[in-house]
Amino acid sequence: SVTGETTPGLYAQYTYKLGEKLTVMPGVRWDHSDRYGSFVTPRLHVKYSPAKIITLRALAGKGFRSPHALAENVTLLASGRDVTVSPDLKQEEAWNMGASVSMNIPMFGKILELNEEYYYTDFLNQTIINFDGAKGAHTLSFENLDGKSYSHTFQVDATYPLFSGMTVTAAFRLNDVKCTYDGVLRQKPLTSRYKGLLTLSYKTPLELWQFDVTGQLNGDGELYDRSRYPAYFQLQAQVTREFRKFSLYVGGENLTNYKIDNPILHSHHPWTSAFDATQVWGPVTGAMAYIGIRYKLEKL
């Protein structure tokens, strides 16, 4: 990985606007790394608003990144695995693109805020983290990508005021993140396939009290050995009382009391290669309550 690198660069951008409806921003960046040489990064952003209630956005471009294998993954050292780092890690390189739609839709005398977005990343070079791969069991290897690696992400979220003081927010995200390990294209470990969120927030007419409840659904995914962990649901709640110069709040987290049964593998043998505290895919503590105060400082 990179221990020292100097990268001067030049950047140029052009902005074209057609009234208030269309904005186009192409750009290009040239950099020269004393480790990887010269590289060019093009970008394009487009924003189009055909009507007041809708805004379309699109982007495409290329990205480069210098890997810092151990510095960026210190938590992965919390195991007894044998760690190896390839001496010739390449600069990471990827194409990315995406699009989004934002709408403010009149509905029953109120405004529904609806957003949809999709992003795609295709890696040409990537530093992958290979667990228990060709180097054997209980190993961790930082290697260059040899095959495909990509990420598809789709998200939709909506906010709507049901009635005076009551706001509902819902969101759902799908992830398709795959990478090639030892010649096999598989789901990236410890990456949930989906996530859902529902929040109810209510303020009393004088805004002295606020009540918030949030439910979160976390999707299933793969572990290092290709076994799967299950989806699980969590619930959070908070009550806030506003005063003139401060606010008092009380709440609870993980009210469903969901916990992983065995978060640390082989915890009774911490000095063996089988010890592993890096596969924590969910909460390790049960339901928790808290209380706090926020004080509002006067403007100077």
Stretches with model-predicted labels:
Residues 168, 239-300:
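C-terminal beta-signal and adjacent terminal beta-strands/loops
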Residues 10-16, 44-48, 99-103, 156-160, ...:
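Residues on the lipid-exposed face of transmembrane beta-strands in outer-membrane beta-barrel proteins
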Residues 2-33, 39-43, 160, 164-173:
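Surface-exposed extracellular loop regions of Gram-negative outer-membrane beta-barrel proteins
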Residues 24-26, 56-58, 97, 112-116, ...:
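Transmembrane beta-strands of outer-membrane beta-barrel proteins
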Residues 49-51, 55-57, 90-144, 150:
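Membrane-embedded beta-barrel scaffold of Gram-negative outer-membrane proteins
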Residues 17-21, 114-122, 144-223, 294-299:
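Gram-negative outer-membrane beta-barrel transporters
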Residues 6-8, 28-34, 60-66, 73-75, ...:
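Transmembrane beta-strands of outer-membrane beta-barrel pores
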Residues 16-20, 24, 40, 48-52, ...:
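Outer-membrane beta-barrel strand-turn architecture
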